[in-house]
Amino acid sequence: MIDIGELLRAYRKGYFPMSDPSDGKLYWCQPYNRAIIPMESYRPSRDVRRLLRRNDFRVRFNTDFEGVIRACAAPRPNAVETWISESIIESYLELNRLGIAHSVESWYGDELAGGLYGLAIGGAFFGESMFYRRSYASRIAFDRLVMHLRKRGYLLLDAQIMNPHLQKLGAVDIPHKAYMQMLDAALHKKIPFL
């Protein structure tokens, strides 16, 4: 398990952990460009809006954090390796018990159909990973997260490293210096997640 104090200090300084799938070694990452979701300009896609109207999924917070993080860590069809090691899982389970790590879950009946997890510190939410078992389930969870963070007054939704999926969700890359300024402002807020 990663030392919880060290983990929280790292996030406050703009770092996040990833483990190497080949040997399990932990690395602290601080990319030069940081992917963030500009919450004020976020708009759900037409498909997500349609699914929200149909009400096929129920979104819950923190009812199955372990189920979400383990689903995120599971091998995916297009990638056999994962950066989410058992050490990272145990650390985030402890952060969840402490009320710092949270899951946003899309339920389809009694099935955990998709979701995401991350950390809430001050006015910043650090999104870690998402998964889905039914089409659009993770996007529904993501949409509800953005709406929740907006309503609570969060200043930063950190998506860490840009990828095509995050781009579809509206993520943009910003330089390290701009990210650190946003992070500093967000960390000075005291906003409960729930």
Swiss-Prot record:
EC assignment: 2.3.2.6
One Pfam family of this chain: Leu_Phe_trans
Subcellular location(s) per record: Cytoplasm
GO molecular function, one term: leucyl-tRNA--protein transferase activity
Keywords of the record: Acyltransferase, Cytoplasm, Transferase
Source taxon at top rank: Bacteria
Reaction catalysed by this enzyme: N-terminal L-lysyl-[protein] + L-leucyl-tRNA(Leu) = N-terminal L-leucyl-L-lysyl-[protein] + tRNA(Leu) + H(+); N-terminal L-arginyl-[protein] + L-leucyl-tRNA(Leu) = N-terminal L-leucyl-L-arginyl-[protein] + tRNA(Leu) + H(+); L-phenylalanyl-tRNA(Phe) + an N-terminal L-alpha-aminoacyl-[protein] = an N-terminal L-phenylalanyl-L-alpha-aminoacyl-[protein] + tRNA(Phe)
A Gene Ontology term for the protein's cellular component: cytoplasm
HAMAP family found in the cross-reference section: Leu_Phe_trans (MF_00688)
Family, similarity comment: Belongs to the L/F-transferase family.
Name under which the protein is recorded: Leucyl/phenylalanyl-tRNA--protein transferase
Organism, as annotated: Chlorobium limicola (strain DSM 245 / NBRC 103803 / 6330)
Lineage, highest ranks first: Bacteria, Pseudomonadati, Chlorobiota, Chlorobiia, Chlorobiales
Gene: aat
